[in-house]
Amino acid sequence: MKFVLLFGVLLVTLFSYSSAEMLDDFDQADEDELLSLIEKEEARAKECTPRFYDCSHDRHSCCRSELFKDVCTCFYPEGGDNEVCTCQQPKHLKYMEKAAGKIKNLFG
């Protein structure tokens, strides 16, 4: 009986050790793959369009403000037939950023 118990403990120990090593190998492979993906993403990233600049060429290229990404807003100027698109911050997000800044200054 002692032999079976000793053999069982040894088997469980070896199994847990081998599974831990396999998990470490998988984690290392995942980390390497993630780093290579991040490097590729940074290399492919392009310049963002600053606030109040024309974004009609790429409507998803607006820069981020402190908390939120600016939105490409298109409109027709008064008396004009051409559509104009610029990166702007919606007013409700502007107010939220101001409130967050005040709270940060109050508690930070």
Curated annotation (Swiss-Prot):
* Highest taxon above the source species: Eukaryota
Q: Which GO terms describe its molecular function?
A: toxin activity
Q: Which PROSITE patterns match?
A: SPIDER_CSTX
Main location class? secreted
Any signal peptide, and if so, which residues?
A: 1-20
Species in which this protein is naturally found: Lycosa singoriensis (Wolf spider)
- What's the protein here called? U3-lycotoxin-Ls1w
Entry similarity comment? Belongs to the neurotoxin 19 (CSTX) family. 01 subfamily.
List cystine links: C48-C63, C55-C72, C62-C87, C74-C85
| Record's subcellular location | Secreted
InterPro entries (UniProt xref): Spider_toxin_CSTX_knottin, Spider_toxin_CSTX_Knottin_CS
